[in-house]
Curated annotation (Swiss-Prot):
<comment type="function">
    <text>Part of ribonuclease P, a protein complex that generates mature tRNA molecules by cleaving their 5'-ends.</text>
</comment>
<dbReference type="GO" id="GO:0005737">
    <property type="term" value="C:cytoplasm"/>
</dbReference>
<dbReference type="GO" id="GO:0003723">
    <property type="term" value="F:RNA binding"/>
</dbReference>
<dbReference type="InterPro" id="IPR023534">
    <property type="entry name" value="Rof/RNase_P-like"/>
</dbReference>
<dbReference type="GO" id="GO:0030677">
    <property type="term" value="C:ribonuclease P complex"/>
</dbReference>
<keyword id="KW-0963">Cytoplasm</keyword>
<dbReference type="Pfam" id="PF01868">
    <property type="entry name" value="RNase_P-MRP_p29"/>
</dbReference>
<keyword id="KW-0255">Endonuclease</keyword>
<keyword id="KW-0378">Hydrolase</keyword>
<dbReference type="InterPro" id="IPR002730">
    <property type="entry name" value="Rpp29/RNP1"/>
</dbReference>
<keyword id="KW-0540">Nuclease</keyword>
<dbReference type="GO" id="GO:0004526">
    <property type="term" value="F:ribonuclease P activity"/>
</dbReference>
<keyword id="KW-0819">tRNA processing</keyword>
<protein>
    <recommendedName>
        <fullName>Ribonuclease P protein component 1</fullName>
        <ecNumber>3.1.26.5</ecNumber>
    </recommendedName>
</protein>
<dbReference type="GO" id="GO:0001682">
    <property type="term" value="P:tRNA 5'-leader removal"/>
</dbReference>
<dbReference type="InterPro" id="IPR023538">
    <property type="entry name" value="RNP1"/>
</dbReference>
<comment type="subunit">
    <text>Consists of a catalytic RNA component and at least 4-5 protein subunits.</text>
</comment>
Amino acid sequence: MPLTPETLPRHELVGLDCEVVAASNPDVIGISGTVVMETTQMLTLEGADRVWHVPKDSATFAFDLSTETVLVDGDRLVARPARRTENTGDSLWR
């Protein structure tokens, strides 16, 4: 399955450039970097000078694809990465 804006929530996120554009914690808004690790509840972003752990469920992320920037509500990403990427059909994360 190709990486498109429609399929991004079901793809591997590690390696993508990402920015936190909204969050319940105002201190994490504006954090940007490359996704270096993903767990069920967290995205780990490596910036220029540090590594940030951002909760998925309370943030909105902007992922940079080669053609455009895609906004994804973190609630759509809350799942074990392996399970989130293998679901097909009428998926909650689609």
